[in-house]
């Protein structure tokens, strides 16, 4: 069952990227990238991880715009993907990108310090 949830998640990721970029007309929803979709084993709940270009205020506005369009997005997913019941969708920010950038910065600092000591 886990394999099917992964396949549904990947398909939803592809479709959500298209829906958000082409169908959502809300001005609060700017440059959004769908980075991952985690679907529960029973295919009832989908958590969509997004990355937003902009400051914290723009990120919050984007999240509000997506929450407002959640019903429309869910109906579009239901039309595009054949499932018995379309999963409930929740949106969250993907913190892994910032975390990866921070690790990269720390590694560069360590590398610079190592070169100075030589």
From Swiss-Prot:
GO terms, molecular function: ribosomal small subunit binding
UniProt record similarity statement: Belongs to the RbfA family.
Cysteine disulfide links: none
PANTHER family, A to Z: RIBOSOME-BINDING FACTOR A, CHLOROPLASTIC-RELATED
Source species taxonomy: Bacteria, Bacillati, Bacillota, Bacilli, Bacillales
NCBIfam families membership: rbfA
GO CC, one annotated term: cytosol
Keywords, ordered alphabetically: Cytoplasm, Ribosome biogenesis
One protein family per Pfam: RBFA
Gene Ontology biological process terms in this record: maturation of SSU-rRNA
HAMAP family: RbfA
Protein's name in the database: Ribosome-binding factor A
Primary role: One of several proteins that assist in the late maturation steps of the functional core of the 30S ribosomal subunit. Associates with free 30S ribosomal subunits (but not with 30S subunits that are part of 70S ribosomes or polysomes). Required for efficient processing of 16S rRNA. May interact with the 5'-terminal helix region of 16S rRNA.
Subunit structure: Monomer. Binds 30S ribosomal subunits, but not 50S ribosomal subunits or 70S ribosomes.
Subcellular location: Cytoplasm
Signal peptide: none
PROSITE patterns: RBFA
Organism superkingdom: Bacteria
